[in-house]
């Protein structure tokens, strides 16, 4: 029903045409209309003219996303719920059941969203992109961290293009605007030593999050696209653009390896050439961030030489 109304945009669609195309009765049509109105859609009903969509709520439901998708597989199979504890958890369950590569779990709100190192990820309703994608790359487990960097490149390129904002990458999994975090990327996997079974790639983006929804302790370190851009953004369009770019960059990674990703990552990183402190398992290391190793490790130039940093919190 919604797809038909969206086709006509501001024009009326007759009950007769709806009945014919959906092969349903006028009574069934009215039930569909009432359900859509409950979900926040404003639909005008006019005698002898039919039905017209007047207002669409900001939702990331499949019927809002699919008309904009331009991918081969990413997002073509989708699980959507209004509110979930965590899209990562649902995606893991789906992957264990055999979900195909490109399967997407997406929601309007998370009540128990998680970031890197099991930190809380605040996911207020109807204001962000909270999604998890199932991947099945034919790579060894040791190369899986490269997928976080690959996704960082794809999302950064998309957000720069679609919003005009100067989005930069902070190793290993954050995207920043003006030094504040707007996106986090979380890569989790199941596999054996020589082969990844599946990867769940989680992406959380503060899109239309307002200052009221940012916890006090995050005000100085987090922001949103709307706050920085001074306007709101259509989340379905952003999601479709991200999935298209991500699919293309991912396929390029599988075909050509990590080196092209490494070059693109270094071009988009806002931390290279700066003095940083890396909190490593061996203790804090201070030095200049100079690039990425072929493995995806961050290269830190210190007084002792250039060191690869594999897992760390970074302070700039």
Residue ranges and their predicted role:
Residues 1-160, 233:
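N-terminal lobe of the biotin/lipoate ligase/transferase fold
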Residues 3-4, 15, 20-21, 101, ...:
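Catalytic beta-strand/loop module used to bind and position nucleotide/cofactor moieties
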